[in-house]
UniProtKB/Swiss-Prot annotation:
Residues 590-599 have a biased composition (Acidic residues). This is Aspartate--tRNA(Asp/Asn) ligase. Keywords: Aminoacyl-tRNA synthetase, ATP-binding, Cytoplasm, Ligase, Nucleotide-binding, Protein biosynthesis. Its EC number is 6.1.1.23. SUPFAM superfamilies: Class II aaRS and biotin synthetases (SSF55681), GAD domain-like (SSF55261), Nucleic acid-binding proteins (SSF50249). GO terms for cellular component: cytoplasm. The gene is aspS. It is an enzyme of class 6 (ligase).
Length: 599
């Protein structure tokens, strides 16, 4: 790193090669230790720590945690036995000759010392406090690492895409409101009272226009905005690595994306074996109870619908019955099985049926007595369980029961310590339905259109070749040319082949219950562009916050965003959202009433 007015070196640049030389350093006082008239300061900057030795008590006396200081001194080897093998600079120290306090610090609301990094996270305050003082929270080395990792990943992605002849293009932030599956954030247009801009949920339509414009390979790290109910894994504003290509099909996009992912992971020291595995959407739901399956461990779901087709147990007289094995679960106390019932109810289920296989194959548990002798005798073999195991069941509609069992599968793996954050299990999920029911209780997306069907991905997704001529005759079974990339049970991104023919687009909109007049009003500009020769095109977007959090092994995407929002979209740091003044309301026209002008 280059020398500046305040330093000759960064902390971790001070090595054995500089022993006997004078250096000037600048940074924060990470912590201070006093030993018999000698003070030791850990000086911290963005690169790490270096130990400073101060023999002058008057020089050391005013120094406190998080004071910003500049020190000049000579580098020397630490005395034998005093090396710190955990530090990059653990073999040397700097003997201070001069120290200047550049800025003082008040008492901290919480400690950010590197010395606490390897201790329990319980040392940290609640997340609201961390977010209120985010500038302090970001001083912690783990947070600095995440921000640096995010930057390095972006650099690797850019290099990979530019090597494949992609062009980075910035698309507008103020656009017209268009249907994309969530609520828009809107901004008043001061110069056009009563009119509003929308912040883009994605650059979807704009990047399609770029394909029509002749930009055959486009990308950007795009800021996106969605006004949806807050969930732990969502942010109202987020970033995605957006990519689109002309004259390509699904295979081309998937191959390109794999190269980008491999380059990103390589930048962090990991090798990704290509090509990545694939699974169909149906198989993912049937085997893992999720359209974003975690493949770091096995234990697939077992369908028992046929097995229980003549069951006397009314709960299992359902369209779907499935199970997941709880290895060694027979030793689980009854109170823990009761806690599983609460866990299931928190997810909207009525409960979680179970049996246990005791010694000598004896079947126990609340469900056992409700089964026929034939069902009890063959159950262990049917589910692949062993003596000492337990089995959880779910029955009901196929999707809701599978989703519950999929959540059980992951929760069991978590409790068994099988979710290694340093192991990365990628898979493509392909062959998605084109549409989904509008009234799906397990879906929180905003329906696009006014019919019983809404888009599984978005209204501009191309039907698969086998369905182009008939998707509007059988929307329930129609399939699409779409694909998601999944890692460790998280959806990293998704994409599709886009509709480039206005006749197909019109039929899709008709299935969604969007009239021609409504389509022209909301995105007529795209339909108009298609009339002038739109090339076949396809693309994909990676959720950047999610992708970084997976590679960082972070518990939350908020740990890889510099200034994230808390629950409900609140910003404890700045106090946003906040009321605006009466003057601002009048100036921006948020209360504009067109009827008042007529009167």
């Amino acid at each position: 790193m280059s020398q500046t007015a305040y330093r000759t070196h960064h902390a971790t640049e001070v090595t054995e090669a500089l022993v006997g030389q004078k250096v000037t350093l600048a940074g924060w006082v990470d912590r201070r230790r006093d030993h018999g008239g000698v003070a030791f300061i850990d000086l911290r900057d963005s690169t790490g720590l270096v130990q400073v030795v101060i023999y002058d008590e008057d020089m050391a006396r005013p120094l406190r945690s998080e004071f910003v200081i500049q020190i000049t001194g000579e580098v020397r080897l630490r005395p034998d036995g005093n090396e710190n093998t955990h530090l990059a600079t653990g073999k040397i120290e700097v003997v201070a000759e001069t120290i200047e306090i550049l800025a003082k610090s008040d008492a901290l609301p919480f400690q950010v010392s590197t010395a606490l990094e390897n201790e329990s996270e319980n040392k940290l305050p609640g997340e609201d406090v961390r977010l209120k003082y985010r500038y302090l929270d970001l001083r912690r080395p783990s947070m600095q690492h995440n921000l640096k990792l995010r930057s390095d990943m972006a650099k690797a992605a850019r290099h990979a895409l530019e090597d494949m002849d992609f062009t980075e293009v910035e698309t507008p932030t103020f656009i017209k409101s268009t249907p994309e599956g969530a609520r828009d954030f809107v901004v008043p247009a001061r110069l056009v009272p009563g009119s509003w801009y929308a912040l883009p949920q994605s650059p979807q339509l704009l990047k399609q226009l770029l394909m029509v414009s002749g930009v055959e390979r486009y990308y950007q790290l795009a800021r996106c905005y969605r006004d949806e109910d807050f969930r732990a894994d969502r942010q109202p504003e987020f970033t995605q690595l957006d990519m689109e290509m002309a004259y390509v099909d699904q295979e081309d996009v998937m191959a390109m994306t794999e190269k980008v992912i491999a380059a990103i992971w390589k930048s962090a020291g990991y090798e990704v074996q290509l090509p990545l595995p694939r699974i169909t959407w149906k198989d993912a739901m049937d085997k893992y109870g999720s359209d974003k399956p975690d493949l770091r461990f096995g234990n697939p779901l077992v369908e028992l619908t046929e097995y229980f087709k003549n069951t006397p147990f009314r709960v299992f007289q359902a369209p779907y019955v499935g199970a997941v094995v709880f290895k060694g679960g027979a030793a689980t106390p009854r109170r823990q099985f009761d806690a599983w019932q609460d866990w299931a109810r928190q997810r909207g289920a009525k409960g979680l049926a179970y049996v246990v296989f005791g010694e000598n194959g004896e079947l126990k548990g609340p469900v056992a007595k409700n089964l026929s002798d034939e069902e009890r005798n063959g159950l262990r073999e049917a589910v692949g369980a062993e003596e000492g195991d337990a089995v959880f069941f779910a029955a009901g509609s196929r999707e809701s029961a599978q989703l519950l069992l999929g959540a059980v599968r992951v929760e069991l793996a978590s409790r068994e310590g099988l979710l290694d954050p340093k192991k990365f299990a990628f898979t493509w999920v392909v062959d998605f339905p084109l549409f989904k029911p509008t009234d799906d209780p397990d879906d929180d997306d905003v329906a696009v259109g006014h019919s019983k069907w809404t888009s599984m991905h978005h209204p501009f997704t191309m039907p698969s070749k086998d369905w182009i001529d008939k998707f509007d005759k059988d929307p329930e079974h129609a399939m699409s040319d779409s694909y998601d990339i999944v890692c460790n049970g998280e959806e990293m991104g998704g994409g599709s082949v886009r509709i480039h023919r206005d006749d197909i687009q019109a039929r899709v909109l008709d299935v969604l219950g969007i009239t021609k007049e409504e389509a022209d009003e909301k995105f007529g500009f795209l339909l108009e562009a298609f009339k002038y020769g739109a090339p076949p095109h396809a693309g994909l977007a990676l959720g950047w916050d999610r992708t970084v959090s997976i590679l960082a092994g972070a518990d939350s995407i908020r740990d890889v965003i510099a200034f994230p929002k808390a629950g409900g979209g609140r910003d404890p740091l700045t106090g946003a959202p906040a009321p605006i003044s009466d003057e601002q309301r009048a100036e921006t026209g948020v209360d504009y009433d067109p009827d008042a002008d007529e009167n």
